[in-house]
């Protein structure tokens, strides 16, 4: 069993003090948590500092906390913010470690088997190991995760029990330590010393934990006793300092001992025999042969190496679970009394609900056609009700909480006041007849004031037609459609802020990262067409895009007033009234948010120009120029990964592959 370090309280460091209605929200949330309330909602309007409020709550209740976001980008932003707020505590990041992932699948209609194809991001793998190690070693831990945290991870008990604990003066031979390291999936590599490896130099063993980046450990022996343990720089070998206790966790989350492995293999073989009998009785000889060949190969690898590609598909047998029993996940690494915060809960809870069904449909096809044993179905994400069973206390955070969250609790804490004094925008409803000319007039007013405009439409055709019309009228406009990738999207937002163009048109402008303080007008076309983007929640989210500018204004073009429109307008008016009263009582003058315009990471050729597929004619390049471009792209890919922009890193990787294929 791992001895946890002495309890260390969360220590929040910030130049800000709670303001507006943050103090009331923080106090209510903390009182409810300490009073044993299971679920509550923080209903925070856009730009009110919800992350800061979450940080204050964490520091006051002092519990290990899991923060779940609905995508990697948002998780990365939150991770960065929490790291700044809690520099002395363990703030960890846990998302899917794939830069690119094509799951194993089979398409019967075309008899196409798609092999699992993936590219693992080494940095994220390190961060995942760091998260699980921190959870087992200490209590002052915040883990920011995507919904990957509800996917199977391996048994925390096996993971903890397999850990190697070392102290100076401990009696253990060098060879015994080497065998223990191999058992927990460390590799000996005396030349290329990297994460998950160890090297041996006489009576000195150097180990590079899977959870570390630049620092490794040197274990010095005197006979069959540990003489000294030092932390070292992995690159130079320079000693940083001595340590009195070192815990080495396994280099993979799926780990088991020899005895347990043989038991697991016996179960796999029994299931294989049963499934082969079923296939043969149904005359499915091809499926039977395929399953026998694949499974026997995996068994051989497990026996010889203790690991095989796709080992997670046998996790039910490895963990000793019954059929249908939920897998171990990151949630099982937390102690019983921990806090969960769901960011943008109206999106995230929907994802948690939907993960299971999509996973099962794909895997069932693999089982039916002999690519996997039925137990592979139990390597899966949690069902929503299984996730709920892990919840001790939970806070749903959203500007527009969903029906699910509202059904879980009646405790709703509002955070409506913005520290900047900014108000929710005023809203006009205008008829759709003559909307083009009316909109053009409004845009021209904004252009004259050096302000920007968002226009949201319901269809691609409408967006394209409107873009063409505004261009003919001399307006600098761009249309952001679903085919635009992360890098281009970032460039478009930057160019809008810089004034390269004045109007951005899109179908769904609710995605994170679209908060642009320069936008003073949001126009919603077809506002009376009920649906996902025109329901109350969608409208409030869209209205919030104009809440970053002191002159923020929203125009809804509609021929009738729908219930969703009325509720969104009423809710915005209610919030605006509260904000005006607060500003008046405290003498606050609203100010537009000041937000730096961040430059993009540049990919240099020699002139440091951005390289993109559209701008560079790769086919006309010489082999040397292509090699130079590949080197530049690889550097950019690493920089993007370090900045946690993994979508951009994946695009860079795809571009590199295309260039390599040209040679």
UniProtKB/Swiss-Prot annotation:
Domain of life: Bacteria
Region annotation (Disordered) ranges: 1-23
Gene Ontology cellular component annotations, sorted alphabetically: cytoplasm; excinuclease repair complex
Domain UVR residues, every copy: 627-662
GO biological process: nucleotide-excision repair; SOS response
Compositional bias ranges of the Basic and acidic residues kind: 1-10
Cell location: Cytoplasm
Gene Ontology MF terms in the entry: ATP binding; ATP hydrolysis activity; DNA binding; excinuclease ABC activity; helicase activity
Motif (Beta-hairpin): 97-120
Residues that coordinate or bind ATP: 44-51
Family recorded in the similarity comment: Belongs to the UvrB family.
Task performed by this protein: The UvrABC repair system catalyzes the recognition and processing of DNA lesions. A damage recognition complex composed of 2 UvrA and 2 UvrB subunits scans DNA for abnormalities. Upon binding of the UvrA(2)B(2) complex to a putative damaged site, the DNA wraps around one UvrB monomer. DNA wrap is dependent on ATP binding by UvrB and probably causes local melting of the DNA helix, facilitating insertion of UvrB beta-hairpin between the DNA strands. Then UvrB probes one DNA strand for the presence of a lesion.
Protein name per UniProt: UvrABC system protein B
Native organism: Streptococcus pyogenes serotype M2 (strain MGAS10270)
Gene: uvrB
């Amino acid at each position: 069993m791992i001895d946890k370090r002495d309890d260390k309280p969360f220590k929040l460091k910030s130049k800000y003090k709670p303001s507006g209605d943050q103090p009331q929200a923080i106090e209510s949330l903390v009182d409810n948590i300490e009073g044993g309330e299971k679920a509550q909602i923080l209903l925070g309007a856009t730009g009110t500092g919800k992350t800061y409020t979450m940080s204050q709550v964490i520091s006051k209740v002092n519990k290990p906390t899991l923060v779940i976001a609905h995508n990697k980008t948002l998780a990365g932003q939150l991770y960065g913010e929490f790291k700044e707020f809690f520099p002395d505590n363990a703030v960890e990041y846990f998302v899917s470690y794939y830069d690119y992932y094509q799951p194993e699948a089979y398409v019967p209609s075309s008899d196409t088997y798609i092999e699992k194809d993936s590219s693992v991001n080494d940095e994220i793998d390190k961060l995942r190991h760091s998260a699980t190690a921190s959870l087992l070693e200490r209590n002052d831990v915040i883990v920011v995760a995507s919904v990957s945290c509800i996917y199977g991870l391996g048994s925390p008990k096996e993971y903890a029990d397999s850990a190697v604990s070392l102290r100076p003066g401990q009696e253990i031979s060098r060879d015994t330590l080497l065998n223990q390291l191999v058992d927990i999936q460390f590799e000996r590599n005396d030349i290329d010393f990297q994460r998950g490896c160890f090297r041996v130099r006489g009576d000195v063993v150097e180990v590079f934990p899977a959870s570390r980046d630049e620092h490794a450990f040197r274990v010095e022996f005197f006979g069959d006793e540990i003489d000294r343990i030092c932390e070292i720089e992995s690159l130079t070998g320079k000693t940083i300092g001595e340590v009195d206790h070192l815990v080495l966790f396994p280099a993979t989350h799926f780990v088991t001992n020899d005895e347990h492995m043989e038991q697991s293999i016996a179960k796999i073989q029994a299931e294989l025999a049963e499934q082969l009998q079923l296939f043969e009785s149904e005359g499915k000889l091809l499926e039977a042969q395929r399953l026998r060949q694949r499974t026997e190969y995996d068994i051989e690898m497990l026996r010889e190496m203790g690991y095989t590609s796709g080992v997670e598909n046998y996790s039910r047998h490895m963990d000793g679970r019954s059929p249908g029993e939920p897998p171990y996940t990151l949630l099982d690494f937390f102690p019983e009394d921990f806090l969960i915060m769901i960011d943008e809960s109206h999106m995230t809870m929907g994802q948690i609900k939907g993960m299971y069904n999509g996973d099962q449909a794909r895997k069932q096809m693999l089982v039916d056609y002999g690519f996997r044993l039925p137990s592979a179905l139990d390597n899966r994400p949690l069902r929503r009700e299984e996730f709920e069973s892990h919840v001790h206390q939970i806070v749903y955070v959203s500007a527009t909480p969903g029906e699910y969250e509202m059904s879980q609790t009646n405790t709703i804490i509002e955070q409506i006041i913005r520290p900047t004094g900014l108000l929710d925008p005023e809203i006009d409803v205008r008829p759709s007849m003559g909307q083009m000319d009316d909109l053009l007039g409004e845009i021209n007013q904004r252009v004259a004031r050096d302000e920007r405009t968002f226009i949201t439409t319901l269809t691609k055709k409408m967006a394209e037609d409107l873009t063409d019309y505004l261009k003919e009228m001399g307006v600098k406009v761009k249309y952001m459609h679903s085919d635009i990738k992360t890098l281009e999207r970032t460039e478009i937002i930057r160019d809008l802020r810089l004034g390269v163009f004045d109007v951005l048109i899109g179908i769904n402008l609710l995605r994170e990262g679209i908060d642009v303080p320069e936008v003073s007008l949001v126009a919603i076309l077809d506002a009376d067409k009920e649906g996902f983007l025109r329901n109350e929640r969608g409208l409030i989210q869209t209205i919030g895009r104009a809440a970053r500018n002191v002159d923020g204004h929203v125009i809804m073009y509609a021929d009738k007033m729908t219930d969703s429109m009325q509720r969104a307008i009423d809710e915005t008016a209610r919030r605006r009234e509260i904000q005006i009263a607060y500003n008046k009582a405290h003498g606050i003058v609203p100010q537009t948010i000041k937000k730096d315009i961040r430059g993009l990471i540049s990919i240099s050729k020699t002139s440091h120009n951005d390289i993109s597929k559209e701008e560079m004619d790769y086919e006309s390049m010489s082999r040397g120029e292509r090699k130079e471009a590949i080197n530049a792209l690889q550097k950019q890919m690493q920089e993007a990964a370090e900045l946690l922009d993994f979508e951009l890193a994946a695009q860079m990787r795809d571009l590199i592959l295309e260039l390599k294929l040209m040679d």
